[in-house]
């Protein structure tokens, strides 16, 4: 791999496999050695300082650079060199306790210098150059070496983040908090239906936030229709009149709230001294980014590091007339008309969530699915969700088919044609067709080839290791990489990345045991492995499943929600070979997200079944059911829970 430095005072032969070395100058009065990992900001600054000094004193100073690929390899070198340090600098030298990049020492005589700030002080003292006649004073050295770096910076920015979603914003603000000069680029290309939005990415504008608010509206509608009378509420003396749902009012209110969030994000960036540019970013080379805007034109900026956080967009429907379909980019922003009778195409969580809240608001809804529901989730839980949506919510599923064509009728409705699983040609008219067949990473416009960034050919997403791409100064986070497509994951990985780049942290993102919730009419929360994955990974004989059905107390007065077909369900997947260590947790019922957050912490702490059931529950809450799980699947025992 890398070459070793043959004439260094320290013996480096035993770790040469970890080292990349670049010889700068030789045979001069004093030679300085700089060891560090190549994207470390302090190491880069130290190299800029010595470059300036070399220009001042080309005949008196020499520099050798020991360049490591990453922080871990640098630390391995430090540890392996402790014996050499003790011999060269003394067992009580500060070198023995120095653990950060850069590590600087000099020869003639052998002297440990320290880090970046120590190096600058060393030059200011004049020791390094000896100050012979005609040489600059220490103050002049300090002034020249500092201005040589500051007046002509190598890059416009320390970090450019391409993408203004929550992951990109978290990364940029964290980097700025460590004194880095940061720029965020964010421009939303309108959807095929013309929908665009402000700062904050998918989650804030067309994802988590509007979805959760509209889901809540749907739940309120269900309570009004099915539960309110049972709980003593009447809307007139005869109990017949119910409120009328107003889609346009709901969308306007949600829109107003989202715009306040967009504005707050801009204010927050400004307060953190992060430059915000409403431009589309693409690569010219690994350190140069082109900014484009259809009205503002183009320009270029340079940067030391880049984080790609552009997220993903809905996949387009490819059948004839697919352009008539709206996507999740559009459904929350339909201000001019309500959805009406809707066909949802897809079996993803987006498809089922949208179908659920539209039905809850009183619209007729059908869902067309090609294969199984919620492919990446536990399939028993997915089937239970499908059963609930069909039996309890009244949503019809058109299974094992895809649309053959969509055409617009004279009355503005959309005529959808398909072939059912029996081979019969079918057609039906809808007011809205919602395409939710998946999402693709938004990478086509980035010019990744110009920066040497490689994609996973199977998924189309950027290949990374610890968020670092195939180009060392370019990183990627969020939906654009092969990781859980969840906003908190993007936020956490972005924040931790900045801490590693600019605050000497070594904490990596842990993508295991990440909680998530699907906001279908009956909510589903999960963390860890599915039953299928657990059996495949550890063997069916080593897996024990504890499970139960239950009816939440708040559902007990309503005959509609008390029926057995919609009873809630909990499943805990355990490894019998490891003290019933919990591998996966699955919850189907109200407030699933609130229940799952605590379980996520428990799973990160590697809790066991015994610890769970020995915890005192809160009565009478649905989460209390976790503490009284007794029935195993292998026993075949009944799982119907009793009431309070």
Summary of predicted features, one role per range:
Residues 106-136:
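Non-catalytic, surface beta->alpha helical segment in thiol-disulfide oxidoreductase systems
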Residues 323-339, 428-503, 594, 598:
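FAD-site-proximal beta/loop scaffold in flavoenzymes
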Residues 162-167, 171-197, 209, 213-219, ...:
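Flexible, glycine-rich terminal cap/loop adjacent to redox cofactors
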Residues 8-73:
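Local sequence-structure signature of Cys/Sec-based thiol-disulfide redox active-site neighborhoods
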Residues 140-148, 208, 308-364, 368, ...:
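Glycine-rich dinucleotide-binding loop and its adjacent helix/turn
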Residues 159-162, 281, 289, 300-311, ...:
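Short hydrophobic core segments
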Residues 128-159, 177-178:
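Extreme N-terminal leader/targeting segments of oxidoreductases
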Residues 149-157, 174-339, 369-375, 380-381, ...:
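Glycine-rich flavin
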């Amino acid at each position: 791999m890398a070459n070793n430095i043959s004439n260094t005072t320290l013996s480096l032969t035993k770790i040469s496999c970890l080292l990349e070395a670049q010889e700068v100058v030789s045979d001069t009065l004093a030679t300085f050695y700089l060891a560090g990992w190549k994207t470390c900001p302090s190491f880069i600054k130290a190299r800029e300082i010595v470059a300036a000094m070399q220009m001042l004193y080309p005949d008196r100073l020499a520099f050798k650079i020991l360049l490591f690929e990453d922080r871990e390899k640098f630390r391995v070198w430090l540890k392996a060199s402790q014996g050499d340090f003790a011999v060269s600098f003394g067992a009580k030298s500060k070198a023995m306790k120095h653990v950060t990049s850069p590590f600087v020492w000099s020869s003639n005589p052998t002297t440990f210098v320290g880090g970046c700030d120590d190096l600058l002080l060393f030059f200011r003292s004049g020791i390094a150059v000896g100050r012979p006649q005609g040489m600059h004073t220490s103050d002049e050295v300090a002034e020249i070496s500092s201005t040589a770096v500051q007046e002509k910076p190598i890059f416009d920015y320390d970090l450019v983040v391409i993408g203004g979603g929550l992951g990109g914003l978290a990364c940029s603000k964290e980097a700025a908090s460590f004194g880095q000069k940061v720029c965020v680029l964010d421009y939303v290309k309108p959807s095929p239906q013309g929908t665009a939005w402000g700062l904050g990415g998918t989650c804030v504008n067309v994802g988590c936030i509007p979805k959760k608010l509209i889901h809540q509206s749907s739940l309120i509608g269900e309570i009004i229709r099915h539960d309110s009378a049972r709980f003593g509420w009447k809307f007139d003396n005869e109990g017949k009149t119910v409120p009328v749902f107003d889609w346009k009012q709901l969308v306007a209110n949600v829109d107003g709230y989202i715009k306040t969030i967009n504005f707050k994000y801009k204010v927050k960036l400004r307060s953190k001294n992060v430059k915000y540019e409403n431009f589309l970013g693409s690569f010219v080379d690994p350190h140069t980014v082109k900014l484009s805007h259809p009205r503002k034109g183009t320009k270029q900026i340079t940067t030391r590091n880049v984080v790609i956080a552009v997220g993903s967009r809905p996949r387009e429907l490819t059948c004839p007339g697919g352009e008539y379909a709206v996507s999740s980019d559009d459904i929350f922003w339909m201000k001019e008309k309500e959805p009406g009778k809707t066909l949802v195409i897809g079996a993803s969580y987006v498809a089922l969530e949208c179908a659920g809240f539209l039905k809850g608001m009183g619209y007729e809804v059908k869902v067309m699915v090609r294969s199984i529901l919620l492919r990446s989730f536990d399939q028993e839980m997915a089937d239970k969700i499908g059963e609930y949506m069909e039996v309890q919510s009244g949503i019809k599923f058109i299974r094992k088919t895809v649309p053959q064509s969509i055409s617009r009728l004279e009355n503005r409705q959309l005529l959808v044609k398909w072939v059912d699983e029996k081979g019969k040609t079918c057609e039906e008219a809808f007011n809205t067709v919602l395409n939710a067949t998946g999402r693709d990473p938004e990478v086509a416009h980035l010019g990744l080839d110009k920066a040497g960034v490689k994609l996973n050919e199977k998924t189309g997403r950027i290949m990374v290791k610890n968020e670092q791409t195939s180009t060392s100064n370019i990183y990627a986070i969020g939906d654009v990489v092969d990781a859980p497509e969840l906003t908190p994951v993007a936020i956490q990985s972005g924040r931790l990345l900045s801490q590693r780049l600019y605050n000497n942290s070594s904490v990596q993102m842990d993508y295991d045991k990440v909680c998530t919730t699907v906001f279908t009419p009956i909510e589903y929360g999960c963390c860890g492995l599915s039953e299928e994955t657990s059996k495949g990974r550890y063997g069916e004989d080593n897996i024990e499943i504890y499970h139960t059905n239950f009816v939440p107390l708040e559902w007990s007065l309503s005959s509609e929600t008390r029926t057995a077909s919609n009873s809630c369900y909990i499943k805990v997947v355990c490894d019998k070979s490891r003290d019933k260590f919990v591998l996966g947790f699955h919850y189907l019922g109200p407030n699933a997200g609130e229940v799952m957050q605590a379980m996520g912490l428990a799973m990160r702490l590697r809790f066991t079944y015994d610890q769970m059931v020995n915890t005192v529950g809160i009565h009478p809450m649905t989460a209390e059911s976790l503490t009284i799980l007794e029935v195993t699947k292998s026993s075949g025992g009944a799982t119907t829970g009793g009431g309070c």
